[in-house]
């Protein structure tokens, strides 16, 4: 999993056709407060593993900070994006933590397909994520009427 520095140094100048998804673990502060920071670390680590297992070789997973991740898809057909993001959401939701009875995690995902500068797409994916987080454990794709 790449980190924010990688994103800032290598991906900020990305231009062309690509798809960006922003992922945010739901209720992460509650996990830390209820189960402890080791459980929070386990949640982050296993979520990253589940996401990594669900994406294709060449797609890029970045832990942007805290409980936020970015996914950069190259050559992801627009009509396949929702299905892919839903499979990632389900993979995270189905994680088990036998060492922390009762711990369940979910993720909210906002995605945007774009042709153009990365910065514009980050804003669009962030808007979609905002709408996904309003209900938690959802996947929302950017469209003009989200504004």
Protein language model regions, located:
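Short alpha-helical N-box/ATP-lid segment at the N-terminus of the HATPase_c
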Residues: 89
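Alpha-helix C-terminal capping segments
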Residues: 7-16, 55, 92, 97-98, ...
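Catalytic/regulatory signature loops of cyclic-dinucleotide turnover enzymes
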Residues: 124-146
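Conserved long alpha-helical elements within nucleotide-processing catalytic cores of c-di-GMP signaling
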Residues: 3-19, 26-56, 62-66, 70-74, ...
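Core hydrophobic beta-sheet residues of small sensory/regulatory alpha/beta domains
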Residues: 20-22, 111, 141
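Catalytic core regions of nucleotide second-messenger enzymes
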Residues: 63, 92-107, 133
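Catalytic strand-loop-helix junctions within cyclic-nucleotide turnover domains
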Residues: 72-81, 101, 107-124, 144-146
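Structural motif
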Residues: 17-20, 59, 104, 109
């Amino acid at each position: 999993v790449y980190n924010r520095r990688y994103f800032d140094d290598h991906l900020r100048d990305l231009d062309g056709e690509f798809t960006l998804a922003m992922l945010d673990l739901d209720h992460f502060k509650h996990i830390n407060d209820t189960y402890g920071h080791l459980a929070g670390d386990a949640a982050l680590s296993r979520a990253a593993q589940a996401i990594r297992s669900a994406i294709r070789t060449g797609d890029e997973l970045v832990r942007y900070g805290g409980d936020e991740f970015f996914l950069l898809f190259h050559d992801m057909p627009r009509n396949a994006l929702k299905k892919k993001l839903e499979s990632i959401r389900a993979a995270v939701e189905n994680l088990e933590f036998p060492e922390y009875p009762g711990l369940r995690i979910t993720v909210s995902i906002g995605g945007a397909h774009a042709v153009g500068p990365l910065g514009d797409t980050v804003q669009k994916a962030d808007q979609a994520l905002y709408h996904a987080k309003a209900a938690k454990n959802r996947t929302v794709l950017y469209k003009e009427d989200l504004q």
